[in-house]
Amino acid sequence: MSETYLVYHYCTVETFKSILQSKVLWLCDLTDSNDEQEVIRTFVVLWERVKKRLEQTDIPKDVLNNAIHLIDQQYETEIQTEPPYGVCFCQKEDISSQWTEYGDHTKGLSLGFDINWFIHNDRIKQQKPHPSSIQSNAIGCDTVIYHSEEFEAQMADICYKALKEQGTSAWIMCIRPTFKHYSGFVKNPTFEPEAEIRIVYYPIEGIEFAQKDVSVSDLKTNVKKHYEIPWIKGSSKALKSVCIGHNCELSEADVRKLLEENKIGTDVQIKQSECTYRIR
């Protein structure tokens, strides 16, 4: 990613005010999102299709069937425990699908954050993270992968090579960790217009990290379970722009006043949305 790369978080007016006041973004349970296949997509849909591809290969049937049995059992557990937490951004500032789904039908706002600010200031790596005793390995930011036949083929190839080289131990040495690695980023392809980038976190509740070196809070339980990351430190901030929805109650002057009242500064670009959505 370039030195400054803006991504956009669509929200309601109340959420906008809360973000300004708290100066943090919430990382929430991704399995509670609007896509009911979050995480499950990887461990159920993707895995089922990868299995069919593996069954067409030259892997000995006893090795493959044993591995599939072990992985099937493990994946039933995976979709019920240790969900990833995340905050989602769009790579497009002003599109109707985002306004209607996340921006309160154009009554909200689109907030432009520099994703690289979080890398440089919160020490969040550009990576697809995985559960780890080292906190910096358990959190990362990257683009969402929209499920495709090409991606299925890539995953099947990884599994094939692991099974050929490691036999029945491949499921624990490679296959399970790889699917876990991608589970917070694989989505139903019908959501592709969202052009999503995420910050994803894999905490392990009740277990302390051996190394804590990232600016992320402990678990918060007010309103709902979540973790928090700061987007401002001193005079440095990730918030670079605010796009006001076509039907938003706030004017540019109102937004400027809120920024000043919350000591955000005067260098945030404010603009009006060009999405002329009619509320019916």
Region annotations inferred by a language model:
Residues 1-280:
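Partner-binding and oligomerization surfaces adjacent to conserved cores of proteins
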